[in-house]
């Protein structure tokens, strides 16, 4: 079976279409919803939120050491760190 110019062009366009489809699907799956990214956060049951350890400032310092942007105390034993 001979490969004609028409078949070769159809094959190349098919490959290009598949590659672009896979590329577009993989990037669009990263952004979900309306495009507004909520803050990612992690909560720790630690003592920085206790008043004698520092309270809110202690939680912020703890989160800064953990490479987060900020921290927020939930009660006196839970410190939530946000990116």
UniProtKB/Swiss-Prot annotation:
Principal place of residence: secreted
GO BP field: defense response to fungus; killing of cells of another organism
Subcellular location: Secreted
Keyword annotations: Antimicrobial, Disulfide bond, Fungicide, Plant defense, Secreted, Signal
GO CC, any one term: extracellular region
Disulfide bonds: 43-81, 49-73, 59-79, 63-80
Signal sequence, renumbered to the chain: 1-24
Family membership noted in the UniProt record: Belongs to the DEFL family.
Name of the molecule in the record: Putative defensin-like protein 110
UniProt source species: Arabidopsis thaliana
């Amino acid at each position: 079976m001979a490969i004609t110019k028409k078949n070769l062009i159809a094959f190349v366009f098919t490959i290009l279409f598949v590659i672009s489809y896979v590329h577009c699907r993989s990037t669009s799956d990263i952004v979900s919803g309306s495009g507004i990214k909520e803050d990612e956060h992690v909560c720790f049951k630690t003592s920085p939120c206790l008043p004698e350890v520092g309270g809110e400032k202690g939680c912020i310092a703890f989160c800064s050491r953990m490479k987060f942007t900020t921290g927020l105390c939930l009660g006196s034993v839970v410190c939530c760190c946000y990116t």
